UniProtKB/Swiss-Prot annotation:
It comes from the Bacteria. Belongs to the methyltransferase superfamily. RsmI family. NCBIfam families: 16S rRNA (cytidine(1402)-2'-O)-methyltransferase. It catalyses: cytidine(1402) in 16S rRNA + S-adenosyl-L-methionine = 2'-O-methylcytidine(1402) in 16S rRNA + S-adenosyl-L-homocysteine + H(+). The gene is rsmI. One of its GO terms (cellular component) is cytoplasm. The keyword Transcription does not apply. Its EC number is 2.1.1.198. Keywords: Cytoplasm, Methyltransferase, rRNA processing, S-adenosyl-L-methionine, Transferase. InterPro entries: 4pyrrol_Mease, 4pyrrol_Methylase_sf, 4pyrrole_Mease_sub1, 4pyrrole_Mease_sub2, rRNA_ssu_MeTfrase_I, RsmI_HTH, SAM_MeTrfase_RsmI_CS. It is an enzyme of class 2 (transferase). This is Ribosomal RNA small subunit methyltransferase I. Coiled coil: none annotated. Catalyzes the 2'-O-methylation of the ribose of cytidine 1402 (C1402) in 16S rRNA.
Amino acid sequence: MSTPGTLHIVATPIGNLGDLSPRAQHILRTVTMICAEDTRHTRQLLAHFGIERPLLALHAHNEDTLAERIITRLISGASLALVSDAGTPLISDPGFLLVRAARAAGIRVTPVPGPSALIAALSVSGLPSNRFTFEGFLPAKPTARRDRLTHLAHEPRTLIFYEASHRIAECLTDLATIFGSMRAAVVARELTKIFETVLDGTLATLQTQVANDDNQRKGEFVIIVQGAADQDAAKITEGRRVYALLKEHLPPSSAAKLAAEITGAPRKALYGG
């Protein structure tokens, strides 16, 4: 019986090709096959380093159906690498279903660490980094996005979001409206690329800067927002404690309303939290 292969989770550059580590290059040269979110994009990356390996497209629309086929290959002894278009796989990218299936099948899954836009942005933000929460992409529809932000408005940890260029201005507007215009934040754009910018200030000033500069609405964005003040965080914590007790005896909406009246915490933050 053959020894099962290994699934390597390989981080790739988010912009600067010099950030692909020697170990990552070695793994990509030697694996049996590479699973890639976009094979065309990955083929260009491999060509830059003179690497030629078979590629298999693995993305959000086919991951659930391909996972079993890939696991079969791993069990038979093949070694595979999983890459995304940029950065560390699984972070707001496909791969979770495959990794879960591989671990369930007893396959060794090992990380090949490297670039990550959220960590890169946090490291240069100047905002507290000892505790943070990553929310990925906010909902595209305005109502759903505002609801999500309302539930996060009193989160005490530093908040990190990804955002697309065509939504960055309206996202900052919603953040300033819901979190408060004076909340400190950072907008990191095109990290490690030629036109990299890292803007800091209040949500109000950042919204104005981005709205008034076409160049600041191009590229890929990471938004980092300072957590809520301790007083707000204490209110929401107490509100959720009271809400949990009241919910045992009242409908959720009524429990949230009463808990908000008792503690001063926002009702929506309790009902959705």
